[in-house]
Regions:
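Metal-dependent phosphohydrolase cores
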Residues: 1-164
């Protein structure tokens, strides 16, 4: 599962690899903070935003570029399948997709600075400087994969039940 798929190609500080599942939980938290009162289905979409990586792994950007357009096409097809499985539209509305991407960039900035060894100025260039209110109280948690998996599954279940 996603709790066992390392982000940053596993090149992070700490006792545990930072997983796609942990990243996805953080993205959902940031997305929700930026969009209070947003429907549970869109929060579910946020937590599932990297779900295709259970099949294709979390490839670093230079590798994605080297693979070419086939990677993007596969990612889109897997994303559509995951969305349909969880009762979401195959293709998210553009404003929702943009809001999730914005939360993803805040998460990437935090990860880069806190656990991947980037200086803030480097992260600013790559991901944009996050708004201070999005950063307040945000921490990167490195936890055992089994704990992350349980948290991820519980979050998905809670959001799914809120969609009914």
């Amino acid at each position: 599962g996603l709790a066992f798929v390392a982000r940053w190609n596993g090149q992070t500080m700490g006792d545990w690899p930072y997983s796609v599942a942990e990243h996805s939980l953080l993205v959902e938290e940031i997305f929700h903070r930026a969009n209070p009162g947003i429907a549970a289905r869109w929060r579910l979409a946020a937590v599932l935003h990297d779900a295709p990586e259970y099949v294709i792994g979390d490839m670093i950007s230079p590798v994605k570029a080297a693979v070419g357009p086939g990677y993007g096409e596969l990612d889109l097809r897997l994303t559509a399948a995951v969305h349909l499985r969880f009762g979401l539209p195959a293709v998210l509305p553009v404003p929702i997709k943009k809001q999730i991407k914005a939360a993803d960039k805040v998460s990437a900035w935090l990860e880069a600075v806190k656990i991947a060894g980037f200086r803030e100025v480097e992260a600013d260039k790559l991901f944009g400087k996050p708004a201070p209110e999005m950063m307040k109280g945000r921490k990167i948690r490195l936890r055992p994969p089994t704990e992350v998996r349980a948290d991820y599954i519980a979050t998905v279940a809670r959001l799914l039940s809120a969609c009914d």
